């Protein structure tokens, strides 16, 4: 990406920020360049130079920049001296979360008539996480990762004959390799019970509805339209939600109000054999209770998130027949990066 001499838009991005969102700057550049000149400036990961310090030495004239996205590069009121035409700006702090707007900067923007844009929700990764949660569900029901691994070293995986008691599964037959001690087989016909009706949970619910599941959801913070979007029956009481769950998916974000929302009593009320899905944050449930029931072979677990990350080698959850595990991989896809850029760019006016 070469910088035009007098761009109308500029993207200033820290290499440290791109370690969190590696494809956003590329996607934002593609979106903006369709309607005008765009400069992209990358700052070193170790640099704490401000936006003004970066653009004044970037090899282009910043005085015509009207739209600015600063991704992981801090901005100070004094930087506006180098950006006299600036009218709209988006800031993201180095962590990749939040707006990056300080009180001093907000006051300076107000004086200059500069509009600040920020994400109003985290819908940019909703599709990626929801699809991953569905994939975890299918893998948990059908033991796909376990079969993949076993096929590499154990020819017995091809033997579907009744086992004569040497395996734990209660049934075995031609091409029937599910572990029916736990929820298994199809999503169709399953009682899927979801905590949440937001960007991730509503999508996951709609997927399960489309596959023929009986879906109910509990979310004390969601408005009624969210349940219609999900296609799920609204359950008003969490203790009722868990009582008949065959698949239980707590898919709310982790906040002070949701930490431990699913208590040990709720976990203990899950029916024997229930498949638990962890795809947003494990801490919304009582993780010790989930661990206890999984290790006792009372429920199964398909998880991309955990109470401790990275999960230490030797953790008793790893490698179990009733656990599918992946290393916190759900949210960051090319699609999520592109949506991060698209949803932010949509807030800017046309040039």
Spell out what each predicted region is.
Residues 1-73, 216:
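N-terminal glycine-/charge-rich "phosphate-binding" loop or analogous flexible N-terminal tail
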Residues 2-8, 12-31, 124-128, 140, ...:
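C-terminal helix-to-coil terminal segments
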Residues 76, 220-316:
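Rossmann-like adenosine-cofactor binding region
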Residues 63-166:
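Phosphate/diphosphate ligand-binding glycine-rich loop within oxidoreductases
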Residues 69-72, 93, 250-252, 280, ...:
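Glycine-rich, N-terminal phosphate-binding loop of Rossmann-like dinucleotide-binding domains
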Residues 107-123, 271-275, 290-307, 318-330:
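Rossmann-fold dehydrogenase core element
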Residues 7, 188-192, 273:
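Phosphate-coordination loops involved in phosphoryl transfer and adenosine-cofactor binding
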């Amino acid at each position: 990406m070469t910088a035009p001499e007098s761009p109308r838009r500029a993207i200033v991005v820290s290499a440290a920020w791109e370690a969190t969102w590696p494809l956003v700057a590329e996607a934002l550049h593609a979106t903006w360049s369709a309607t005008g000149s765009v400069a992209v400036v990358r700052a070193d990961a170790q640099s704490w130079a401000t936006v003004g310090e970066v653009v004044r030495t970037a090899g282009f004239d910043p005085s015509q920049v009207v739209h600015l996205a600063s991704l992981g590069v801090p901005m100070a009121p004094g930087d506006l001296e180098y950006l006299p035409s600036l009218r709209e700006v988006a800031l993201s702090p180095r962590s990749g979360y939040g707006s990056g707007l300080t009180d001093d900067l907000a006051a300076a923007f107000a004086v200059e008539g500069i509009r600040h844009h920020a994400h109003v929700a985290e819908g940019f990764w909703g599709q990626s996480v929801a699809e991953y949660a569905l994939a975890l569900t299918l893998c948990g029901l059908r033991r796909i990762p376990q079969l993949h691994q076993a096929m590499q070293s154990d020819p017995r995986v091809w033997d579907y004959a009744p086992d004569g008691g040497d395996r734990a599964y209660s049934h075995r037959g031609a091409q029937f390799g599910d572990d029916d001690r736990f929820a298994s087989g199809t999503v169709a016909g399953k009682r899927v019970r979801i905590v949440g009706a937001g960007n991730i949970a509503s999508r996951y619910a709609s997927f399960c509805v489309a596959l023929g599941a009986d879906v109910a959801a509990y979310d004390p913070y969601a408005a009624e339209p969210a349940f219609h979007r999900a296609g799920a029956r609204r359950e008003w009481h969490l203790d009722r939600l868990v009582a008949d769950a065959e698949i239980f998916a707590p898919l709310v974000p982790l906040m002070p109000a949701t930490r431990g929302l699913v208590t040990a009593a709720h976990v203990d009320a899950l029916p024997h054999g229930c498949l638990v899905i962890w795809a947003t944050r494990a801490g919304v449930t009582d993780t010790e209770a989930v661990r206890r029931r999984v290790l006792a072979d009372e429920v199964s677990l398909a998880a991309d998130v955990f109470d401790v990350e990275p999960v230490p080698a030797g953790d008793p959850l790893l490698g179990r027949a009733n656990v599918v595990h992946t290393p916190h991989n759900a949210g960051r896809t090319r699609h999520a990066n592109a949506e991060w850029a698209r949803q932010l760019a949509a807030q800017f006016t046309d040039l």
